[in-house]
Amino acid sequence: MSLRQPPIDHSAKQTDFGGWEMPVEFDSIRTEHAAVRDAAGKFDVSHMGQITVSGPDAARLLGRLTTNDVGSLDPGEAQYAAITDKRGVMLDDTVVYNLPASADEEYLFIPNAGHDGAAYDRFLAHREEWGLDATVTNRTEEYAMIAVQGPDSPDLLGGITPVDLDDLSRFELAAGAVAGSE
């Protein structure tokens, strides 16, 4: 699922990225980059993969497939990591989130566009090979995903969520409704 609606400004330059048709720029990449750095911007990033991993061995599975210590993440924390093969060759980069609202240990793994199927298959294969107790679910087609970035992001989102965003730092997350949707 994505927003899959044409941009309001039909002059947006479109591109195919990982099988997803999306706007790559509206005005200019330089102008948009500066706007996000100085204020805030929102992006439909539904083309990014969304894989959840939960269960007693979830952190162990992700820890063996990424370069960071996923088990060190507290609920509500995230980390940037590389995904490598057995020889240490980098396959992809990712952000791994330890979800805050889960009763059990649950992580959200975000592979790059078009890599979710390969990452999912790899997780399943290694889970079986290593005999780990973890549930792996590819949720890429289930949810739209919007990134809101920039220093004014809390102000932009503040009116549409009851979550206190002022206490969040880089690579931290909170669970809650945005514009009435969980």
Predicted regions mapped to residue ranges:
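Basic, glycine/lysine-rich polyanion-binding surfaces/domains
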Residues: M1-E182
